[in-house]
UniProtKB/Swiss-Prot annotation:
Motif (RxLR-dEER): 49-64
Regulation: induction: Expression is up-regulated at later stages of infection.
Protein's organism: Plasmopara viticola
Role description: Effector that acts as a broad suppressor of cell death to interrupt plant immunity. Inhibits cell death induced by cell death-inducing proteins, including the PAMP elicitor INF1 from P.infestans.
Signal peptide extent: 1-17
Domain notes: The RxLR-dEER motif acts to carry the protein into the host cell cytoplasm through binding to cell surface phosphatidylinositol-3-phosphate.
Swiss-Prot/TrEMBL keywords: Host cytoplasm, Host nucleus, Secreted, Signal, Virulence
Protein name (database record): Secreted RxLR effector protein 9
Compartments in which it is found: Secreted; Host cytoplasm; Host nucleus
Pfam families: RXLR
Keyword Secreted: yes
Length: 116
């Protein structure tokens, strides 16, 4: 009986947390404040933040630099493409991390006298 009670409380807590995260008006205000121009890339910026999850700890300046870098490369993302670009960024960063960990592992496997 006690196990069932703990299980039910955990479900209710999870549902309450997820519904409050979705319906929290502070999140909506936070995301709408970031729209500074009707430019499509700015809309993609906001859409990407919504899809990644908006919280106060997001480094907005770093994301703005990434957005400016994209603008100079003449990449303009529509809001529908924001999810794809966020996914591709995550994929490329994971790929870089994997390559660097492989290099570090190879460096450890090579004896010190054979390193260049």
């Amino acid at each position: 009986m006690r196990l069932i009670y703990i299980f039910m409380v955990s479900i209710v807590t999870t549902l309450h947390a997820s519904s409050s995260a979705i319906l929290d008006p502070n999140d909506v205000k936070f995301t709408t404040k970031n729209v500074e121009s009707p430019d499509s890339s700015d809309a993609a910026y906001v859409a990407g933040r919504i899809l990644r999850g908006t919280d106060g700890n997001v480094n907005r300046e770093q994301e703005r630099k990434i957005l400016l870098k994209r603008k100079h490369k003449r990449h303009y993302y529509k809001p529908s493409h924001a999810h794809d670009s966020a996914g591709s960024e995550a994929f490329h960063s994971a790929k870089k991390a994997l390559k660097s960990s492989i290099r570090a592992t190879k460096a450890r496997l090579v004896p010190p006298y054979q390193r260049r």
